């Protein structure tokens, strides 16, 4: 019986820790409960390299075969197929020019694909179209860890800081959160923090993280990070997203 109570306590603790701080209110969300993607919120990115800059192998489409909504979930599906000169297809969507924000609490419930050459991501780019980037979650290959990374360019020179989780089953649904304030960008999974970047007073020229950013979701195949050895037996494989919610502090 004590183990049941412990499980319930830990489950409740995770729920509480994964929720926004007191005083934060919902300002944007997508629960993915509609029949199709809400294009008032999202834009499809389509095409292949050199558009993406990572030597990825897939062609991003907006076809039902690669992106669809079902059972209250967004499905982004990577496939092995010949299409427009590429041997793989997938999907990538963004809120660019639809929604961007500065500071807040980001909450998303996501199940990630895992496999050799697979590179799913939930991330953000600067709304001013500079290259500054906040990678909320990325996973590569068969690793059962998730990486969170901030990229910026002090004095025009590239730098980054990142953190990673302990080993866990990334293919199951987990709650991924970011608390972004004037002082820090803090990343957590199921309420467990794994990386925090100090941006207080734009220390280390982190001033780019005091501007607006927009959201992106995608599943890449191959590329500079996962490499180019792809297990073709794993396809189709997909990311599933239950919801994304953005809260702001009053």
Regions found by a protein language model. Give the residues of each.
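Bacterial Sec-dependent N-terminal signal peptides
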Residues: 1-19
């Amino acid at each position: 019986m004590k183990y049941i109570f412990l499980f319930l306590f830990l489950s409740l603790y995770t729920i509480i820790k994964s929720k926004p701080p007191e005083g934060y209110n919902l300002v944007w969300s997508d629960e993915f409960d509609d029949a199709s993607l809400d294009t008032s919120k999202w834009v499809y990115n389509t095409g292949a390299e050199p558009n993406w800059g990572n030597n990825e192998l897939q062609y991003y489409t907006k076809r039902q075969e690669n992106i669809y909504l079902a059972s209250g979930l967004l499905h982004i599906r990577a496939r092995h197929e010949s299409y427009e000169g590429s041997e793989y297809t997938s999907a990538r969507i963004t809120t660019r020019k639809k929604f961007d924000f500065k500071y807040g609490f980001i909450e998303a419930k996501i199940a990630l694909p895992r496999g050799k050459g697979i590179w799913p991501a939930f991330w953000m780019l600067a709304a001013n179209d500079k290259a500054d980037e906040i990678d909320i979650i990325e996973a590569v290959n068969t690793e059962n860890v998730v990486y969170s990374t901030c990229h910026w360019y002090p004095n025009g020179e590239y730098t980054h800081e990142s953190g990673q989780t302990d080993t866990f089953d990334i293919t199951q649904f987990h709650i991924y959160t970011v608390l972004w304030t004037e002082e820090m960008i803090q990343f957590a999974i199921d309420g467990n923090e794994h990386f925090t970047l100090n941006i207080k007073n734009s220390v280390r020229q982190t001033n780019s993280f005091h501007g607006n950013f927009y959201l992106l979701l995608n599943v890449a195949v191959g590329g500079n990070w996962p490499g180019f050895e792809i297990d073709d037996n794993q396809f189709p494989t997909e990311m599933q997203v239950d919801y994304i919610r953005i809260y702001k502090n009053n």
